[in-house]
């Protein structure tokens, strides 16, 4: 009789014991030296995982009693990395982070271990985001990681307006010529306008003038001078005096300026590259007259006072929420004829005009507030049913492809007004909840720290309004809450609220701001509003109609301006500020 017995996890058991022997310096027959640090190991183990070690053993005709010594340059691999590599060779486990991925890639290259290289490649793909895509592109080019290179390049191209801004330019000025030239040549480059592209080129050349001046002539040809403003052309002309062989470029600039003097002034928009960005307000979903739900996606182009239809949502809903993050718009929740609180979530790609289904929200929500902070999308509060509010704050985790509970507000609310400060803090200001059995807006400010998942500051203050307020920051610590009846200035440092004499005028149709309106701050103290319900002039009839107009409030002078009429009158649509590529104008 014969019986076969197999030990479970025997290979792992053997390697674990070999690793213990290595750390105790037992039975070793090779050593790696890095900057006075000596690491002992077993030749057979390393030869099995590293073609480098196997080659050294075979090429030197080593005998079983011989010992192998390898000296590693500490400028290439640190002692800590070599120790981590040895642990990986013996256990097959490795922890990769943004801090150690470059050295691990060097280690994979040095020891010629393809599997470790694959792990590093996968980590880079899963962890890439706006703030690190420039560094990841450098790594991808250095270690020939094509998929990472393509993703990182797309990340830089899609966020060029950030990298060329004062906030991002400190790192971007180190961009190598081959990458910088490729970006300027790209018709889909996301610049604010061609002015930014020309200014970025001049700043990049002057950052290392002696070595980069030779690239200026070639890269200058990638700029469409007809799309550049007179002010920036004059700036460029002055800068050219500091560069050699600039006469041809100066002549081109002078030619454009002279032509403009002789022609009728016209918009530069038609000359912009396809990827140039347009500040826009995007309206999604909503409810039409007679109760029909909408799936249309419309964009108001601020610069042109023009409405466009972008797309159609994959579902019809009102009281949903939306936020923009880079080239994407995220939408979730809402109500339909059949379901009062939807879990569904989608992502719209403004560049490709395409939709991607996302994992469902953990719970169905209406009147929740979606917001982007630090490049991450959050959903704040909301209702799961009439008069049933939640305090949950959800975060969409791009790596896990899941909605995760980020934390909770101090009290359950829907219809909250939210403003961000930096890349870390959400300020959740007022919201609707049940007070003594009645739906009422409460005066509360929660400062939610997205890193800790905690409300780090909660301030309550008396309010005399039940409509949706407008928010803005004055100086660094003063949060202004503007409404029709009263305005409040909250000192976040002293935790003190003071009434202000300024107030928000009623809409031109004499209605107050409400959760049914699409409301969007668009910078420079201006607020966009459209849709929502309006009460009939005869108060006795108590009839409600949907507001067909769009308005713009200039808070500096306290006046409303009526804008181009929206394509449809909508109640409770989602609304967000977005930067749309100029190529969408070609769809008109």
Swiss-Prot record:
Please name the source species.
Rattus norvegicus
The record's section on SUPFAM superfamilies has:
Kelch motif (SSF117281), POZ domain (SSF54695)
One MF term from GO for this chain? Answer: ubiquitin-like ligase-substrate adaptor activity
Q: Where is the BTB domain?
A: 28-98
UniProt-recorded name of the protein: Calicin
For the modification Phosphoserine, which residues carry it? 149
Output the superkingdom of the source species. Answer: Eukaryota
Q: Where is the BACK domain?
A: 133-235
Q: List the InterPro entries hit by this protein, alphabetically.
A: BACK, BTB/POZ_dom, Calicin_BTB_POZ, Kelch-typ_b-propeller, Kelch_1, SKP1/BTB/POZ_sf
A GO cellular component annotation here is:
cytoskeletal calyx
Top-down, what is the taxonomic lineage of the species of origin? Eukaryota, Metazoa, Chordata, Craniata, Vertebrata
């Amino acid at each position: 009789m014969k019986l076969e017995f197999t030990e479970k996890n025997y290979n792992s058991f053997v390697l674990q014991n070999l690793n213990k022997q290595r750390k105790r310096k037992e039975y070793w027959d090779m050593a790696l030296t890095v900057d006075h640090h000596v690491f002992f190991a077993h030749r057979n183990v390393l030869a099995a995982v590293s073609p480098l070690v196997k080659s050294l053993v075979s090429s030197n005709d080593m005998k079983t009693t011989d010992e192998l010594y390898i000296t590693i340059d500490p400028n290439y691999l640190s002692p800590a990395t070599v120790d981590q590599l040895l642990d990986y060779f013996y256990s097959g486990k490795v922890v990769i982070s943004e801090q150690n991925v470059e050295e691990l890639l060097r280690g994979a290259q040095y020891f010629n271990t393809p599997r470790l290289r694959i792990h590093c490649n996968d980590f880079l793909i899963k962890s890439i985001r706006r703030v690190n895509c420039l560094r990841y592109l450098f790594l991808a080019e250095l270690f020939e990681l094509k998929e990472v290179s393509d993703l990182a390049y797309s990340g830089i191209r899609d966020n060029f307006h950030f990298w060329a801004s004062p906030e991002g330019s400190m790192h971007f000025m180190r961009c190598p010529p081959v990458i910088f030239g490729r970006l300027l040549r790209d018709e889909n480059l996301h610049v604010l306008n061609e002015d930014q592209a020309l200014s970025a080129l001049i700043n990049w050349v002057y950052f290392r003038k002696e070595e980069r001046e030779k690239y200026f002539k070639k890269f200058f040809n990638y700029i469409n001078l007809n799309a550049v403003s007179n002010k920036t052309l004059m700036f460029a002309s002055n800068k050219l005096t500091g560069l050699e062989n600039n006469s041809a470029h100066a002549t081109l600039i002078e030619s454009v300026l002279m032509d403009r003097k002789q022609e009728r002034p016209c918009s530069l928009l038609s000359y912009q590259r396809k990827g140039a960005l347009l500040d826009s307000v995007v309206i999604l979903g909503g409810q039409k007259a007679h109760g029909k739900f909408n799936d249309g996606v419309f964009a108001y182009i601020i610069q042109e006072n023009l409405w466009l239809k972008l797309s159609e949502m994959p579902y019809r809903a009102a009281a949903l929420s939306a936020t923009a993050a880079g080239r994407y718009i995220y939408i979730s929740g809402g109500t339909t004829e059949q379901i009062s609180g939807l879990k569904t979530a989608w992502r719209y790609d403004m560049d490709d005009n395409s939709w991607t289904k996302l994992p469902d929200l953990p719970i169905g929500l209406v009147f929740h507030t979606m917001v982007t902070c630090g490049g991450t999308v959050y959903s704040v509060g909301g209702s799961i049913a009439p008069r049933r509010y939640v305090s949950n704050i959800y975060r969409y985790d791009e790596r896990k492809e899941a909605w995760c509970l980020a934390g909770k507000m101090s009290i359950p609310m829907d219809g909250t007004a939210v403003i961000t400060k930096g890349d870390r803090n959400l300020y959740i200001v007022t919201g609707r909840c049940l007070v003594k059995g009645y739906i009422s807006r409460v005066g509360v400010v929660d400062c939610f720290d997205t890193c800790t998942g905690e409300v780090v500051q909660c301030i309550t203050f008396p309010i005399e309004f039940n409509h949706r307020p407008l928010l803005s920051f004055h100086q660094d610590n003063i949060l202004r809450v503007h409404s029709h009846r009263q305005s409040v200035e909250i000192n976040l440092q002293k935790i003190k609220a003071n009434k202000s004499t300024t107030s928000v005028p009623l809409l031109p149709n004499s209605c107050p701001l409400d959760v049914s309106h699409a409301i969007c701050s668009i910078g420079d103290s201006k607020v966009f509003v459209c849709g929502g319900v309006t009460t009939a002039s005869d108060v006795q009839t108590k009839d409600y109609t949907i507001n067909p107009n769009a308005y713009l409030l200039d808070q500096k002078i306290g006046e409303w301006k009526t804008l181009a009429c929206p394509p449809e009158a909508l109640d409770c649509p989602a609304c967000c500020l977005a930067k749309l590529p100029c190529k969408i104008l070609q769809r008109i």
